[in-house]
Amino acid sequence: MLPPGASELATKIISELEVFVFNRDIRDFFSAFYQEDFLVKWPLLDVVSDNALETYLSTTWHCDGPMKGLLKCFLYLNPVSEHGCNTLIIDEVRTRKLQSVNALPLELERRHTDISAFLQTLGLPETPIEFDLCAGDLLIFAPHKLAHRCLPPRAGKMRYTVCFSVFPESAFKCQIS
């Protein structure tokens, strides 16, 4: 959470970093991935503090709601090695199996910080995918297809990221017949 009055600074940071993130190579990547133009929506300067288990909704395993073509892009502003607040991801095959046994509920109060028992019961590997991200690294994934959670930072540490939601342009076109 940002301190009160920080929204102007956050807006300035986001607008300056958006130009850096969506350089020609990244724009070409998204255009090729979607096979059409894309839109960047709802940029957010995200500050995760060491009390994240009590204050931050994404510390439990979940999939985002099914928004057609959504990719999340997290630009890490400080390295995971500094704060330990990594984004853990489960591959699509294991995610589908976890969904089939209701291990990834949409309701916040029913979500889990530990899904190892579900994975064991399903006979699946328990180790999530994680990256040793450095400042300036970009994590891109499909949050409606891949289970994920944010680990809370170590005591006294904070994670700073800018999150961008990227969609194919067609996701926002109304079709009138």
Which residues does each predicted region cover?
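Active-site region of the double-stranded beta-helix
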Residues: 36-40, 62-66, 77-86, 92-94
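Histidine-centered catalytic micro-motifs
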Residues: 58-65, 145-150
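Non-heme Fe(II)/2-oxoglutarate
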Residues: 102-103, 138-140, 145-177
